[in-house]
């Protein structure tokens, strides 16, 4: 464990509140190892620790606490322009260890957003791989990582193809992602 990770963990503990912990456990029932930290604090920490780079992203993810994984996703968002394809590889690796909707959505919607247009093909390739997974969180992620592209009408047929592949999925959180993408189309987002 690096000194930088210890410093981040110390700061996370300093920002812990019982209200935030109760809220996280209420809204993310299967969250594990919850500190109890509000999202705005994580956003500030992501910017503060960007110099930790990809090494800190990996360390945070591997530490395994709920907010550490969220912070890893947010930090990746801040630094992904340094190496978009490596950032995508991290998202692919992280996909195997996702265990709740909040981390899934943070990884899928935030980690690659600044480089999504630049690596669009590669993101769709990863989506195509994840959609076939037995892991429900990888299937959900297969839609969440392409949500950013719902604003582009030229990509709607490709996105709808994926939505249709998961329309009959048995898993609640996969169904929620399907509904979410369809709603984006209906609202023109």
What are these regions (language model features)?
Residues 1-189:
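Alpha-helical scaffold domains
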């Amino acid at each position: 464990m690096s000194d930088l990770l210890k410093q981040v963990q110390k700061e996370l503990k300093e920002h812990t509140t019982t209200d935030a912990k109760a809220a996280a456990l209420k809204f993310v029932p299967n969250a594990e190892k919850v500190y109890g930290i509000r999202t705005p604090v994580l956003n500030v920490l992501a910017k503060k620790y960007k110099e930790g780079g990809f090494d800190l992203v990996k360390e945070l993810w591997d530490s395994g606490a709920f907010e550490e994984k969220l912070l890893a996703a947010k930090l990746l968002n801040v630094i992904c322009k340094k190496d978009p394809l490596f950032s995508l590889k991290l998202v692919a690796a992280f996909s195997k260890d996702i265990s709740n909707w909040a981390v899934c959505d943070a990884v899928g919607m935030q980690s690659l957003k600044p480089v999504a247009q630049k690596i669009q093909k590669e993101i769709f390739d990863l989506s195509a791989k994840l959609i076939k997974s037995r892991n429900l969180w990888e299937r959900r992620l297969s839609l969440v990582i392409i949500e950013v592209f719902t604003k582009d009408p030229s990509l709607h047929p490709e996105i709808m193809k994926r939505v249709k592949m998961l329309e009959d999925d048995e898993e609640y959180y996969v169904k929620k992602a399907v509904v979410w993408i369809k709603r984006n189309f209906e609202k023109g987002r």
